[in-house]
Design a protein with these regions (language model features):
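Detector for C-terminal structural segments
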Residues: 17-26, 31-34, 276-308, 336-340, ...
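A structural "hinge/loop" feature
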Residues: 46-60, 112, 161-167, 449, ...
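Aromatic- and charge-enriched surface segment that lines or borders ligand/interaction sites
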Residues: 56, 88-131
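Surface-exposed binding/hinge segments that line
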Residues: 131-176, 184-189
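A bilobed periplasmic-binding-protein/Venus flytrap-type ligand-binding module shared by bacterial periplasmic
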Residues: 198-201, 253-276, 289
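Ligand-site clamp/hinge motif
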Residues: 202-245
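Ligand/substrate-recognition segments at binding pockets and active sites
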Residues: 314-377
Length: 482
C-alpha cells in the first residue's frame, strides 16, 4: 500500500466498503512518499483509454490535457489561445497561411528529443479521424517549412485555427507511441484499478509542484445508485462520514456546460408545437422538481451567460402531437428529466416514448434516426464560444436534428463566420446562429451543474477549472511536520 503497488489495490477491491474506507483513509489525499509529494484521488469509475480525438468523459478530457500538449493552449485566465509547443505564430494578410514556430528544446516523455516532422506526422494522423477532419475542414495541407516551423495552408481563412489546435482533441502524442506525450505529466500506469502520472522532467513550461498523482479506482466507496453522473464532486480524500467535515470546499462554481434538448421539425412536430414543448419545460415546475440530489443542478435561463433563451406567449392553445419519441444519453440526471417530461406530456394528451442510449455521446451506433426529441449534455472545458462552434461542426447530432438543406446552410454559415479575424465579431455572429436555433425551438438548454472541489487540510493550490477539475500543475503539499 505504502508503495502504491497495483497488486495491493486489486486485493482491496475484495473488501467491504466500510473495511476499505478504514484501510484507505491514511493513504488518501496528499502524502509524502520517500521525500516525494504525491496526491491520491479516489475515483468512482475506471477511466476510459486516452484515444486521439474527442473523449466523452470530463476526467479523460482533463487527463489528456495533463499528458499531452498542443501547438497552442488556452490561457487559463483569458481563455484565449497562446503558445505551447509553438512559442509564436504568424498569419498571412489573406488568412490562408499560418506559420507556427516550434520550440527548440522539446522532449517526449520517454526522453527523446522531439522533431517537428514527428508533430507533422501526428497531425496528419489526426486529420484522418472523421470528427477531426470535420474540425479542420479548411486545412488544405500542413508542411514542415523549416526544422522549427510548421505551416498550415488553408482553403479558406479560419480564425478559429489556433483554438482548434489548443483543444484537448488536437493535442499531440508521439506518432508511434500513442500514450507518450510532452505534457506536464507522463503516464506511468494505466489499469482499471490504478492510474498514475508523474511529472515530466523536460517539460517546456512551468513545472508541476507535485511529483505524482494517482487515481485509485474505488467504486465501492461511492453511492452505487449514482451510475455515471456529473454529481460526483472531485473530492481529494476519503473519510468516515463523521470525518468529512474536515474536508473543506476549496472551490465551487456553475458549469458553463449544460444538458440540452433538441427538437426535430417534421410533419409530426411543427415550430409552434416545439415552442410549446420548450415553454412547458421552462415555465412549469418541471426542472425545479427533478428527483436529483439537492444543490446538484441549476435550471438554465441562457445557453451561455448573456445568450438568453427566448420568451413566447399564448402557446397554451397549441395542440401537441399525439405521439413523440425522445432519445437521450447519459448522464443519469437525464433519466429523471425524461420520465418527468413523459408524465407531464401524458397529462396533456401526448404519449412520449423514451429510448435510452447508454453512452456519453452520440458517437458510433445511435438511435437518433427514430427521434423527434433528443437530450444529452454538452461539456464545455474552455473557450465556450469556440467549443459551441466545434459542437455544431463535429457532433453527429446536428445532421439528425436539421434536415439536409438546413444542415448545409448551418455549415456554410460557420464557414463564413470563421473568416472574421475579429474575435468579438465572430462571437456575435455565432451568438446569432444559436439565437436562431433557440427561436426556432430547435435547441434549448435544460440545466447546468454545480461543480465543487473539496480537499483535506494540507493540499494547497487547488483551483476549480472550467471542466470541474483542478490544475494538477498548481497543486502542492507543504513538507511533513517533523
Amino acid at each position: 500500500m505504502q508503495k502504491g503497488e497495483q497488486r495491493s489495490v486489486l486485493e482491496l477491491a475484495q473488501l467491504a466498503p466500510g473495511e476499505l474506507r478504514t484501510l484507505l483513509q491514511p493513504f488518501m489525499g496528499g502524502q509524502w512518499h520517500n521525500d516525494t509529494p504525491t496526491l491520491r484521488i479516489p475515483y468512482y469509475r475506471p477511466l476510459d483509454p486516452l484515444r486521439p480525438g474527442f473523449l466523452p468523459g470530463r476526467a479523460e478530457q482533463h487527463l489528456a490535457g495533463q499528458v499531452f500538449s498542443g501547438l497552442t493552449r488556452f490561457d487559463s485566465t483569458t481563455q484565449r489561445p497562446c503558445g505551447d509547443l509553438a512559442h509564436h505564430w504568424d498569419i498571412s494578410a489573406d488568412g490562408l497561411r499560418w506559420d507556427f514556430y516550434i520550440r527548440s528544446t522539446l522532449h517526449w516523455h520517454n526522453g527523446d528529443v522531439l522533431s517537428t516532422s514527428q508533430l507533422h506526422q501526428r497531425l496528419q494522423q489526426l486529420l484522418e479521424l472523421p470528427a477531426l477532419n470535420k474540425l479542420f475542414i479548411s486545412v488544405k495541407c500542413i508542411e514542415v517549412t523549416h526544422p522549427q516551423c510548421l505551416t498550415f495552408i488553408l482553403h479558406r481563412p479560419d480564425f478559429w485555427l489556433a483554438h482548434r489546435l489548443a483543444s484537448y482533441s488536437s493535442h499531440l502524442a508521439h506518432p508511434e507511441q500513442p500514450l507518450v506525450g510532452t505534457g506536464p505529466f507522463r503516464l506511468t500506469l494505466f489499469t482499471p484499478e490504478l492510474v498514475r502520472i508523474e511529472s515530466h522532467d523536460h517539460y517546456h513550461l512551468s513545472h508541476p509542484l507535485l511529483k505524482a498523482i494517482e487515481f485509485w479506482i474505488t467504486p465501492q466507496l461511492f453511492d452505487q445508485d449514482l451510475g455515471t453522473s456529473c454529481r460526483h464532486p472531485v473530492q481529494i480524500a476519503i473519510g468516515k462520514p463523521e470525518e468529512l467535515p474536515m474536508l473543506s470546499q476549496v472551490s465551487s462554481g456553475i458549469s458553463l456546460g449544460f444538458c440540452y434538448l433538441t427538437l426535430r421539425k417534421s410533419a409530426r412536430l411543427n415550430v409552434l408545437q416545439a415552442r410549446r414543448l420548450v415553454n412547458i419545460i421552462h415555465h412549469s415546475s418541471l426542472l425545479q422538481t427533478l428527483e436529483v440530489e439537492e444543490n446538484l443542478i441549476t435550471p438554465s435561463n441562457a445557453l451561455l451567460p448573456g445568450w438568453t433563451i427566448p420568451q413566447w406567449d399564448q402557446l397554451d392553445e397549441v395542440a401537441l402531437p399525439e405521439k413523440l419519441t425522445l432519445v437521450y444519453h447519459l448522464p443519469v440526471e437525464l433519466h429523471a428529466m425524461a420520465e418527468q417530461l413523459r408524465q407531464v406530456l401524458a397529462t396533456l394528451g401526448c404519449e412520449l416514448t423514451l429510448i435510452f442510449h447508454n453512452a456519453k455521446n452520440w458517437d458510433g451506433d445511435h438511435p437518433l434516426a427514430q427521434a423527434d426529441l433528443m437530450m444529452g449534455d454538452r461539456l464545455i472545458g474552455e473557450a465556450p464560444e469556440y467549443t459551441l462552434e466545434q459542437w455544431l461542426r463535429c457532433d453527429q447530432l446536428w445532421p439528425h436534428v436539421l434536415d439536409a438543406p438546413a444542415f448545409s446552410h448551418l455549415q456554410a454559415t460557420l464557414d463564413a463566420l470563421q473568416t472574421q479575424a475579429n474575435e468579438d465579431h465572430r462571437h456575435a455572429a455565432l451568438q446569432q446562429v444559436f439565437t436562431n436555433l433557440m427561436n426556432d425551438a430547435t435547441l434549448t438548454p435544460l440545466f447546468n451543474y454545480h461543480y465543487r472541489i473539496s480537499a483535506p487540510p494540507g493540499v494547497n493550490g487547488v483551483r476549480l477549472n472550467p471542466r470541474g477539475w483542478f490544475e494538477f500543475t498548481e497543486a502542492w503539499l507543504p513538507p511533513p511536520s517533523s
